[in-house]
From Swiss-Prot:
Residue ranges flagged as DNA-binding region: 16-55
Name of the protein: Redox-sensing transcriptional repressor Rex
Gene assigned in the entry: rex
Superkingdom of this protein's organism: Bacteria
Gene Ontology CC annotations of this record: cytoplasm
Membership in a protein family: Belongs to the transcriptional regulatory Rex family.
InterPro entries assigned to the protein according to its UniProt record, in alphabetical order: CoA-bd, NAD(P)-bd_dom_sf, Rex_DNA-bd_C_dom, Tscrpt_rep_Rex, WH-like_DNA-bd_sf, WH_DNA-bd_sf
């Protein structure tokens, strides 16, 4: 099936399914029901079945889903055998945490380099990742770097995004409050932690469990 027709909400849930199925496989489990998946990932069973239906017959009624088959399917669908190389721009507290973490649970995603303007950080390694001066951004970003993580001050986020647009980067994970304007060939995911926290507090107050 043409993955362009898969709803974005479904696409966002695929890595969640994949991680749980990975854990099932490691535990030696051979099959799983949509109800078990629902309980584990906190997505209702009907939504899971609908998500899976976009990819054809992944399971059998009365049997559930074969764990190894799902693992193989999602690995291919999510391109888990291809390495995604990432650059991080902004080595403050959040950026430093990313460098130490470096997606240890995702073997196909690696931060290769970082950029900052601090004299104390430029020329060092954090979590084994070299930190370069921001002035070297275009020079250092190779054609292999496809994704950038932005953890810079909001005041400079747009100017950095403009520079990234001149490189081979096609995806930006933006952790700044700034809403960025870039060309259509670059996809941006905005993650504003303050907004997420405010949303959580609102739901706690207005939708008590």
């Amino acid at each position: 099936m043409d993955q362009q027709k898969i709803p974005q909400a479904t696409a966002k849930r695929l890595p969640l399914y994949y991680r749980f199925i990975q854990n099932l496989s490691l535990s030696g489990k051979q099959r799983v029901s949509s109800a078990e998946l629902s309980e584990a990932v906190k997505v209702d069973s009907a939504t899971i079945r609908r998500d899976f239906s976009y990819f054809g017959a992944l399971g059998k009624k009365g049997y559930g889903y074969n764990v190894n088959y799902l693992l193989s399917f999602f690995r291919e669908t999510l391109d888990q055998d291809d390495i995604t190389r990432v650059a991080l721009i902004g080595v403050g507290n959040l950026g430093t945490a990313f460098l130490h973490y470096n997606f240890t649970k995702n073997n196909n995603t690696k931060i290769e380099m970082a950029f900052d303007v601090s004299e104390e950080k430029v020329g060092t390694e954090i979590g084994g990742i070299p930190v370069y001066h921001l002035d070297e951004l275009e020079e250092r970003l190779s054609t292999d770097i496809q994704v950038a993580i932005l953890t810079v001050p909001a005041t400079v986020a747009q100017s950095v995004a403009d520079r990234l647009a001149e490189t081979n980067v096609h995806g930006i994970l933006n952790f700044t409050p700034a809403r960025l304007n870039v060309s259509e060939n670059i996809r941006i995911h905005h993650i504003d932690l303050a907004v997420e926290l405010q949303t959580l507090v609102y739901f706690l107050k207005n939708y008590p469990q």
